[in-house]
Amino acid sequence: MIDTLLDPMIWLILVTLGHTGPGVILPTNWADDTAKMVAGWMLLTSVTLLYLAFGMDGEEQGRLALVIAGPVWVWFLVCISQGLEYTMGKEPITMTWKANAPPLVLWGVLALSGLLSSGWV
């Protein structure tokens, strides 16, 4: 049961959905060219995650999931702890613990599932 819950493929798909929909598509101001360019660049992460979910398996999948998700999780921690602000839509958004709990949990569990299936522990 725990192996199924911590299967990197499941978390790769969940992170891709969370990253693509509420993370990029919904908050983007599509009238702004810079925002469109940044959103397009960020959507490339979704392609990478989907390839990793469906094109790899086993320890290789776990290791690459860890290598991708681990730094993203650390990046969220640093941005939140510094209270950084960004503008992706019409209003500036400040990185707070409350607002960023869902992506922090998703990327963190993806990194954990990758670590546990990597064969490194």
Give the label of every model feature segment:
Residues 1-18, 119-121:
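Cytosolic juxtamembrane helix and N-cap/initiation of the first transmembrane helix
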Residues 98-118:
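Final/C-terminal transmembrane alpha-helix of multipass membrane proteins
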